[in-house]
Amino acid sequence: MDRYSRNMEMLTLEENISLRSKKIAVIGCGGLGGYILEMLARLGVGTLAVADGDVFEESNLNRQLSSDTGVIGKNKALQAKIRISTINPDTEVIAFDRNLTAENAREILSGCDIAMDALDGVGSRLVLQQACEDMEIPMVHGAISGWYGQVST
């Protein structure tokens, strides 16, 4: 538990242990999603289901954690899995190298305790919201643009 000793200032031992059994979906692995994924892994979440059909571009280098010059053209979800494995090998990452759609949402969200929206489009966000409602999975919405951000549940 030494890895998580600083968590004890905000979470109880039982809550820390509980995180290991949680499965959280993070949909969108770019700017916001990369930070969410990294913090959840550092916090000690047991399983992360990540989905993103996009690839890294040079314009991502200044703001996306999983990007570097060696991953240009590579899928964001697959690269997030690699990065998380070096940060916390105890966190299992199930990576989907495709965008969430109405057709694949059930597969991606299966068994998740909560879904994190880190998407950059309203259409895909509505698909996620509907799937979460249908599957009775709580959803946390997040968005950023420049110096502004928003979060809601």
Regions found by a protein language model. Give the residues of each.
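Aromatic pocket-lining residues of Rossmann-like dinucleotide-binding sites
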Residues: 40
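Glycine-rich phosphate-binding loop and adjoining beta1-alpha1-beta2 segment
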Residues: 45, 50-88
